Curated annotation (Swiss-Prot):
Its cofactor is Mg(2+). Deubiquitination at Lys-191 and Lys-194 by USP32. Phosphorylated at Ser-72 by LRRK1; phosphorylation is dependent on protein kinase C (PKC) activation of LRRK1. It comes from Rattus norvegicus (Rat). The modification Cysteine methyl ester is found at residue 207. It comes from the Eukaryota. The gene is Rab7a. It is an enzyme of class 3 (hydrolase). It is a peripheral membrane protein. This is Ras-related protein Rab-7a. Mg(2+) binds at residues 22, 40, 63. GO terms for molecular function: G protein activity; GDP binding; GTP binding; GTPase activity; retromer complex binding; small GTPase binding. One of its GO terms (biological process) is bone resorption. SMART domains: RAB, RAN, RAS, RHO. The small GTPases Rab are key regulators of intracellular membrane trafficking, from the formation of transport vesicles to their fusion with membranes. Rabs cycle between an inactive GDP-bound form and an active GTP-bound form that is able to recruit to membranes different sets of downstream effectors directly responsible for vesicle formation, movement, tethering and fusion. In its active state, RAB7A binds to a variety of effector proteins playing a key role in the regulation of endo-lysosomal trafficking. The keyword ATP-binding does not apply.
Length: 207
């Protein structure tokens, strides 16, 4: 029995500054939460080995800065991504309104082979806070309009739905990685013109 090659899944977390991208990543990978806010400069990543449908994979989770001046760093970080996580703060409506621009930014920078079906997952974070301003139905409706993106409501602080969300992220990322592998193994056939087909037919006929 041949051993399967190790799979590395690249996951990008995007969203406005302060929505909890770093906290979600730290809660998932390290089971830790800090109340001290420190803006991410540029980008940072953590790795975690997980089982996805009986397959061991390594998730490389990239946490990119939410400040506009760092969005130009995108190409290097986004290329080769297997899944993109869009995060907003349920207590800050403006962070929800910018999901469209973050999604568009990713598709432009990453240039996935099949943008229509590229896997996104949306997280509505900070549900532990009382002053909620973005309704669940509103977020679900947006996700549905974007090819039915999976949606989770999370709390990095209380570890609510973080594990479940990243299980879906890992599964969707693995599916994307597998499809890319299949595409690379079976590229489009080379089309011969009429003269080349006739020549090939004559050469193969040894009556």
């Amino acid at each position: 029995m041949t051993s399967r090659k190790k799979v590395l899944l690249k996951v990008i977390i995007l969203g406005d500054s302060g929505v909890g991208k770093t906290s979600l990543m730290n809660q998932y990978v390290n089971k830790k939460f800090s109340n001290q806010y420190k803006a991410t400069i540029g980008a940072d990543f953590l790795t975690k080995e997980v089982m996805v449908d009986d397959r061991l994979v390594t998730m490389q989770i990239w946490d990119t800065a939410g400040q506009e001046r760092f969005q130009s760093l995108g190409v290097a970080f986004y290329r080769g991504a297997d899944c993109c996580v869009l995060v907003f703060d349920v207590t800050a409506p403006n962070t929800f309104k910018t999901l469209d621009s973050w999604r568009d930014e990713f598709l432009i920078q990453a240039s996935p082979r099949d943008p229509e079906n590229f896997p996104f997952v949306v997280l509505g974070n900070k549900i532990d806070l009382e002053n909620r301003q973005v309704a669940t139905k509103r977020a679900q409706a947006w996700c549905y309009s974007k090819n039915n993106i999976p949606y989770f409501e999370t709390s990095a602080k209380e570890a609510i739905n973080v594990e479940q969300a990243f299980q879906t992220i890992a599964r969707n990322a693995l599916k994307q990685e597998t499809e890319v592998e299949l595409y690379n193994e079976f590229p489009e056939p080379i089309k011969l013109d009429k003269n080349e087909r006739a020549k090939a037919s004559a050469e193969s006929c040894s009556c």
